[in-house]
Amino acid sequence: MIDSKQKIAVLGAGSWGTALAALVARHAYPTILWGRDVGVIQSIDIQRQNFRYLPSIMLPQTLRATTDLAAAVSGADWVLVAVPSYAFTETLRRLAPLLSTGVGVAWATKGFEPGSGRFLHEVAREILGGDAPLAVVTGPSFAKEVTLGLPTAVTVHGEYARFTQMVANAMHGPMFRAYTGNDVIGAELGGAMKNVLAVAIGVADGMQLGMNARAGLITRGLNEMLRLSAVIGARPETLMGLAGLGDLVLTCTGDLSRNRRLGFALGRGQSLSDAIREIGQVVESVQTSDEVMRQAEQHGVELPISEAVRAVLREEITPYAGMKALLAREQKPEYLDILFKANSSL
């Protein structure tokens, strides 16, 4: 049931933040969107469009926008953060002193903290303190399709069931399904790794390696998610759901995926700098590939596809050499016997 008195502040006026703010505003929640770009905020507040990130899509009249963070979160019942991973820590540090006691924070950011490789829930808990209700929103969702009202399903994971359900309720509607769970680690892992794996599938498509190669890479990429999840305390069923498999399939096959487009350009022989410049928005995989491999190396888990992507994005090897190395790997069983067993290590 919708609580019409519930005020929501959405932080981040990029494509995803705008899409989520428009979604909850259409569900009759008083919603204010915060962003740094004055031009973007003015276009939303006056013309009802985000001309930079979601051009030609009209936004609801009830959605307000501001560049004043304090004004955005004042009186908010909860906050939804939708900034790139590189801005996550800074945004929370600015947010923390402005929050009233008991105000929950959810985020739709995907990735790890750059530099440290920490999960975002670890960053949030450290900055916001031990009592703040926290949740992560993830799953297969292109911002443009959400804003157009096309059918979408996501999942919200958190340790506080009441807050998790509150976030899901605000998003859930006739064309947008929001499921719930309590595996924050698994939800964050899937959302981060799929960006890295999408680069590999994009490279294969750019090199015209065929649909068989695409399917094989997606499946083996899912295997890498499961291998890492087994040693960090995540549950395999989370990775087999919307947070893992669902997001992986969308990001690896959808032409709206920036990470897939990056890989496709590299597979066609374009330079990394030119490909990023043409995309024109943040491509999370460039940073996240380092953090995924940091996690893998810390836990002694082999992730050959992710490792190859990191090497390509560091420009240590060519995309062709990366694919050749993957195909030359020794034959082995498809799954380790302990992969789906609880409390096991790889």
UniProtKB/Swiss-Prot annotation:
Keyword Nucleotide-binding on entry: yes
Which E.C. number(s) belong to this protein? 1.1.1.94
Residues annotated as catalytic: K194 (proton acceptor)
State whether keyword Kinase applies.
no
Cite a single Pfam family from the UniProt record. NAD_Gly3P_dh_N
Which residues does the record give as NADPH binding sites?
S15, W16, R36, K110, A143, R258, V282, E284
Which superkingdom heads the taxonomic lineage of this protein's source? Bacteria
Q: Which reaction does it catalyse?
A: sn-glycerol 3-phosphate + NAD(+) = dihydroxyacetone phosphate + NADH + H(+); sn-glycerol 3-phosphate + NADP(+) = dihydroxyacetone phosphate + NADPH + H(+)
Keyword set, alphabetical order: Cytoplasm, Lipid biosynthesis, Lipid metabolism, NAD, NADP, Nucleotide-binding, Oxidoreductase, Phospholipid biosynthesis, Phospholipid metabolism
Q: Where in the cell is it found?
A: Cytoplasm
The pathway is: Membrane lipid metabolism; glycerophospholipid metabolism
One cellular component term (GO) for this entry is: cytosol
Binding annotation for sn-glycerol 3-phosphate: K110, G139, S141, K194, D247, S257, R258, N259
Q: Name one GO biological process term.
A: carbohydrate metabolic process
Broad class of enzyme this protein falls into: oxidoreductase
User: Could you tell me which SUPFAM superfamilies the record lists for this protein?
Assistant: 6-phosphogluconate dehydrogenase C-terminal domain-like, NAD(P)-binding Rossmann-fold domains
Q: What is its main location?
A: cytoplasm
One annotated GO molecular function is:
NAD binding
PANTHER family of this UniProt entry? GLYCEROL-3-PHOSPHATE DEHYDROGENASE, GLYCEROL-3-PHOSPHATE DEHYDROGENASE [NAD(+)] 2, CHLOROPLASTIC
- Similarity field: Belongs to the NAD-dependent glycerol-3-phosphate dehydrogenase family.
Q: Which HAMAP family would you find in this protein's record?
A: NAD_Glyc3P_dehydrog
Q: What does this protein do?
A: Catalyzes the reduction of the glycolytic intermediate dihydroxyacetone phosphate (DHAP) to sn-glycerol 3-phosphate (G3P), the key precursor for phospholipid synthesis.
Q: What is this protein called?
A: Glycerol-3-phosphate dehydrogenase [NAD(P)+]
